[in-house]
């Protein structure tokens, strides 16, 4: 039995998931997911969001249950810290600084950079090294630069089995690479997004911190549930474990407790300012899309 995280329509409303962009900025391909317009702001139909979010979480659960790798991608300022925190919390991988062209389609070259990053880490951590302070500072500078770009995937060990993306417009190169390699893509789609190439679309606000936090957290929780199910099948008692990181080594899962971080900013940004007075009951009726 699949035990997916529970959420309600109120959770979506309180997270500001229903707020789209100004009507003038919309992508017509998102019309099926739009409920209407309020104060020149497109409002997302949360009935669609509920159904599609459940579909996406079920697909994600199935991938992780088979010990597949999940890559979180979100490089915009308001998503960066959340993407890293939630990927780490569930033991998965992330890109939160800048997507380097070829990260998927040219994995062999990226693997060489990962190898170089690990070499720098060993050099710096080796207390018996014979390098001067100046040389060590140079190594640290190079290590830090690589870590910003590929630190979140340095232990991935191969291509991911599924992508979870915040802001498909900004991360369009990553999506194209995934499509080329037939890697499924789960993505939050705002009203200005292009749903083309997205296997599991989730209509929702991809700009506000609270909305991003909601989606990243529920994705992370789903991954943790799948890992718990996998561990339970192996006879491991996982009762009471809520947050733990998971590392994959030779198809075995090793778990360790990890402190949950609570340093996220809860302020909304961009497309939430003009529709704060909308009531929950206004969002769950039939579709009234704009043509």
Swiss-Prot record:
<feature type="compositionally biased region" description="Low complexity">
    <location>
        <begin position="263"/>
        <end position="277"/>
    </location>
</feature>
<dbReference type="GO" id="GO:0022627">
    <property type="term" value="C:cytosolic small ribosomal subunit"/>
</dbReference>
<dbReference type="InterPro" id="IPR018130">
    <property type="entry name" value="Ribosomal_uS2_CS"/>
</dbReference>
<comment type="similarity">
    <text>Belongs to the universal ribosomal protein uS2 family.</text>
</comment>
<dbReference type="GO" id="GO:0006412">
    <property type="term" value="P:translation"/>
</dbReference>
<dbReference type="InterPro" id="IPR023591">
    <property type="entry name" value="Ribosomal_uS2_flav_dom_sf"/>
</dbReference>
<dbReference type="Pfam" id="PF00318">
    <property type="entry name" value="Ribosomal_S2"/>
</dbReference>
<dbReference type="InterPro" id="IPR005706">
    <property type="entry name" value="Ribosomal_uS2_bac/mit/plastid"/>
</dbReference>
<feature type="region of interest" description="Disordered">
    <location>
        <begin position="254"/>
        <end position="291"/>
    </location>
</feature>
<dbReference type="GO" id="GO:0003735">
    <property type="term" value="F:structural constituent of ribosome"/>
</dbReference>
<dbReference type="InterPro" id="IPR001865">
    <property type="entry name" value="Ribosomal_uS2"/>
</dbReference>
<keyword id="KW-0689">Ribosomal protein</keyword>
<keyword id="KW-0687">Ribonucleoprotein</keyword>
<protein>
    <recommendedName>
        <fullName>Small ribosomal subunit protein uS2</fullName>
    </recommendedName>
</protein>
